[in-house]
């Protein structure tokens, strides 16, 4: 297994996902921040003293999840978004499409009460955080994007293959 996605944390939990795992399911695991020692769950176990919840499938390949309030949002490389209840692992919504045939390698960012998810084809999906899947806007730049965005001073910085963009109000 090659761990590509970065861990994220909220509510005393640290969320880990597998990244590249040749021909195997990609798990997502919620580890208690205070856990120590060997906390590996047994084969069919979903919880241990150190693991709050674990799913054998649903982890991202490259992107890092993002945690906002009570929810964990996981964009998958094939252009879908899944939302979990962060503390329990309960699926809120699953594999909601972000366009058709999109590839996502950049990690999402959040700002001003919105989640920004960019595709390699230059589309930026603006999603409302919360239990209902809602795309607020889709913006398109004519460039390839693989790098994660940065947010600073009310501006969104996007590095494309050829240009650096700064988008603000």
Predicted region positions:
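Noncatalytic, solvent-exposed loop/strand surfaces
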Residues: 1-169
